[in-house]
């Protein structure tokens, strides 16, 4: 079978929001292999001899099967993209073979050093760890969270900064499980996560096991936080949309142990003050703010 590679380059005043909206079109129309491409520096030397140049513009790409209905589906993509207010989207297509598609998406993923010692390694990239490196083995999949997005990268760095040996850890919106993997390798004790997507729960579990984390040492449930058992945790992490974070702050508050902290990411800068106000209204004290690109991550503790 042949596939149609669809690429959407976009420009907007709020690039973070534009990225979300354009990507949502691709997901809604069930494109395969969706990748968000953002301008980044060239990979560091030693991050894989096969590494290619990083993209120089913001774009979203995905794949459609080359069928009789493909023209109609592409027209639907264009219609939805043209309807986005304040976002200039340029679409392009090319035909690729099955084998080309199976390998081409790998071009966009590299070994990524998140901090001085925290590293994410895709299976097809060569990498020699330095002494003291904590390496997360993770291949991009269906679930959100590969470490390449600013929100995940900030979360990982903050987990490394905030985790203490033996700490109890809860990941709200587990996605790929990358934050749970990091917490486990950084010394967390109790390790739990939840996601409302059953596919993500299954993927996360496999990713943890791939990183040699025993299934007996973690638990991931397909549920929402309001339905999750009322346990107490030393560190609760939520890398999700800002409006969702605001809505679940009372639940996060009730899940924190005395002295516990929450790491909140997935917050577009335009929502920063609203989230901070909601934290104060829900009995939190802001401990730290960090920014990367158009995104903000916060650390808060109980008053």
From Swiss-Prot:
Keyword Signal listed: no
One Gene Ontology term, aspect cellular component: cytoplasm
InterPro entries: Ribosomal_L11_MeTrfase_PrmA, Ribosomal_PrmA_MeTrfase, SAM-dependent_MTases_sf
Key words of the record: Cytoplasm, Methyltransferase, S-adenosyl-L-methionine, Transferase
A GO BP annotation: methylation
Protein's job: Methylates ribosomal protein L11.
UniProt protein name: Ribosomal protein L11 methyltransferase
Taxon lineage: Bacteria, Pseudomonadati, Thermodesulfobacteriota, Desulfobacteria, Desulfobacterales
Gene: prmA
């Amino acid at each position: 079978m042949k596939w149609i590679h669809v690429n959407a380059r976009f420009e907007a005043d709020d690039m973070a929001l534009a990225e979300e909206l354009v990507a949502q079109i691709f997901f809604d129309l069930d494109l395969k292999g969706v990748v968000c491409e953002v301008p980044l520096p060239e990979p560091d030397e030693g991050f894989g001899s096969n590494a290619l140049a990083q993209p120089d513009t913001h774009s979203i790409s995905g794949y459609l099967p080359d069928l009789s209905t493909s023209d109609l589906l592409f027209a639907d993509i264009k219609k939805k993209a043209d309807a986005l207010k304040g976002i200039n989207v340029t679409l392009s297509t090319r035909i690729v073979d099955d084998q080309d598609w199976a390998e081409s998406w790998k071009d966009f993923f590299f070994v990524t050093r998140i901090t001085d010692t925290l590293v994410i390694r895709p299976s097809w990239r060569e990498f020699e760890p330095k002494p003291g490196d904590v390496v997360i083995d993770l291949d991009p999949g269906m679930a959100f969270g590969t470490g390449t997005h600013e929100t995940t990268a900030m979360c990982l760095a903050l987990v490394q900064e905030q985790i203490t040996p033996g700490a109890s850890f809860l990941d709200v919106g587990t996605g790929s499980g990358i934050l749970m993997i990091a917490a486990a390798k950084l010394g967390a004790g109790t390790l739990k996560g939840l996601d409302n997507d059953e596919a993500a729960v299954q993927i996360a579990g496999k990713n943890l096991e791939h990183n040699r984390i025993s299934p007996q040492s973690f638990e991931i449930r397909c549920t929402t936080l309001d339905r999750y058992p009322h346990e107490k945790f030393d560190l609760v992490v939520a890398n999700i949309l800002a409006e969702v974070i605001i809505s679940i702050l009372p639940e996060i508050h009730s899940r924190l142990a005395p002295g516990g902290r929450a790491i909140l990411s997935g917050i577009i800068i335009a929502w920063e003050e609203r989230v901070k106000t909601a934290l104060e209204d829900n009995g939190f004290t802001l401990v730290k703010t960090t920014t990367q690109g158009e995104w903000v991550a916060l650390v808060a503790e109980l008053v």
